[in-house]
Amino acid sequence: MKRRKKALCALALCLLLIAAVFLLGLGGAQKTWEDLPYTLLEFEGGRAIDLAQGGSYGEMNRGPGLTLPAGEYRLKWAIDGDGDNVIRITSGNGAAANPAEIPVTAGSGEGSCLFTLDRAAENVQIRVDFASGTRIDVRDMRLYSPMYRDGAFAFALLAAGAYALYVLHLYGRLGPKARGRLILVGMAVLIASGPALKNTIGIGHDTTFHLVRLCNLADGLAHGQFPVRAGGYAFNGYGAITSVFYPDVFLYIPAMMMNLGASLPFAVNAFFVAVNALSAAAMYVSAKRIFREEWAAVCASILYTLSIYRISDVFTRYAFGEMTAMVFLPLFLLGLYEVVWGEKRSWPLLGASAACIFLSHMLSTVICALTAVGVCALFIVRIIREGRILPIAKACAAAGLLCAFQLVPFITYSLEGIGAQELAKDPAFYALHPAQLFLLGAGELSGDPADWRLSTFALEIGLPLIMGAGIALYAAAAREAADTQTKKKDGFAVLLVCAGVLFAVMATTLFPWSHVRVLTRGLSDYLQFPWRFLMMTAALFALAGGYGLAVYARGHGEQMAAAVLAVAALCALPTLTDEARNNHFIAFGETVSPNWQYTEYTLPGTKTAATLDPGVRADEGVELAQVERDGLAFRAQVRAADGGEIALPLFGYDGYRAELDGQALAWTAGEDNRLTVKLPAGADGELRVYFAGKALWRAAEGVSLLTAAGLAAMALLRKRKESGADKR
């Protein structure tokens, strides 16, 4: 009880300090673009123009060409002139600045003005228009971003980490040996997080796609959706339903951080660090539970955290979904182990981890499902003999019910013909040559040599994992005498290595992908890249390697773990260094362009170029007044004596509702797939259009919520029973 009181007091103090930092406005950061006339503005005729020397009127410059998030900005200038001139602010995607024109009066010299961007603006132009007088000289111009709260969030995260360590210490979980193990694993996390410890986001393979997903999610949250189905950031405000087809449950935290004042680079980099830390923790817990050996858990955690495929997922591919799925992959393997070989009452772990993987990345779910089916088929006799079919069925049911809130909208839109068919690829074309698995760093790949993404990043198992797996085999083969439990551990480690080898083979040209494509009638194309199977190889080899290295250490676990850390870090650092030095990035104060060109998960026939028109179109005879927009919602006063149509700058996805003074109106996806409202004759009142979703979706959300609550209650009751048994 005393420990609980101390923990609660520490929690209260931690929350109080965090609240104080935010309320006092501490830790703010602002981006300043200084000396714009000398850096980002291009003056065709020079910064100074004199009519007496042959100069002429007109816009003097172009630039800075920034992509800026919505918000309030301050512009300062020092412009000498004897006439009244104008600074004009525009964007390349139709986002409006208010005011869009700033007067510069004769003889004013220096001045400043606040302006607001109503939404994210691509290719922002701040142009000086020499409109009157005989001379002008643009001496200086500076742009100030909104104030971001990155420092406050950094303090909050550090305070939360310190509190977690204090609680572990308070409950006796952080003794001298535990501290040593934590330091070694923490070093692996720190090294793996190197490229995230800066205020920029490197541009990788899928950076743009996933950052727009994140910003779209943040927009949906900011405008009251929960869970988010559609957001109004993508496609220049026309909206996207990526949250339905690409689960983003675990992106809610960085999205909420952004809505509370964090910059995009800070939120994303904090997410990457969290992914690394949680991946390390998940592998540690799983290896310790399976092998009952602390140093096996430490070595496995280090191997997994610094595995080259996982690191490439984070910092080369920027594969938000797959990297998040790899957080839960060790827990999935642990759950599968328990249900098939261990404590079959642990089926909730298998169900919950499978659900978390699905809610991270659907393709990773397919790989995990294939793994589970293969294991069950291989050990079907054992499963039937020991009565393990029911726990497996319960795990499957739990996973399905937990994901119902995501599955039901997904199925709804899929039945309407929305999907990502254009992303399907022939897996045989992208299979690796076997030699690639044994390289260090980027190597030559099969496929189109013009595809730079496939020729400039590491697609391999990695030396540390290969050595770990090899030593696991050696430890099992060279052991002369062992008890039954040790033999079981050795056998399971060998099984893990064999499974990892199989998945590695599936990533290469050795696997008959052409035949698989025929047998599955093209369904295998949705896997896109066979080298995705290396994610499973990394997890399996890390588990087996951690155990083998701990056995091979022969009582010198500390030294072995330190050696594993050194070797794994040395093999990972070349890739980490390249990514940290990436000179293509999104800087602090900037954002990703909302002018999205991807057409997956859109209505058939969508043309992204049409989204550059942000205007509302109305038929002749339809009067509009007081038009207001809030995310994906529109309000306006309308009058149409003879009826008519209004086309809004929104894609007409199923789930919108149109009302005139509270009465439902019909709408359709019209020209350019715009949401087009049909007004009846004599319409006169307030038009309201908003994304409401469907009642069936709400029912599915209730099912998932009740399932999660039930599993949590089961876990709590089980823990209390075990605690009571220990006391007796």
Where are these regions (language model features)?
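Glycan-recognition and processing domains
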Residues: 6-72, 90, 95-99, 132-134, ...
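Extracytoplasmic
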Residues: 191-194, 214, 218, 568-625, ...
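Active-site-proximal, structured, solvent-exposed surfaces of multi-pass membrane proteins
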Residues: 69, 610-728
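Extended, low-complexity, turn-rich repeat/linker tracts enriched in Gly/Pro/Ser/Thr and Asp/Glu
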Residues: 79-87, 132-135, 654-655
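Extracellular carbohydrate recognition and processing domains
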Residues: 94-121
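Short beta-strand-plus-loop segments that form exposed binding edges in beta-rich domains
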Residues: 126-134, 691-693
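Extra-cytoplasmic beta-strand recognition segments
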Residues: 62-83, 113, 141, 658
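Membrane-embedded transmembrane-helix bundle of lipid-linked glycan/lipid transferases
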Residues: 2-27, 144-583, 689-728
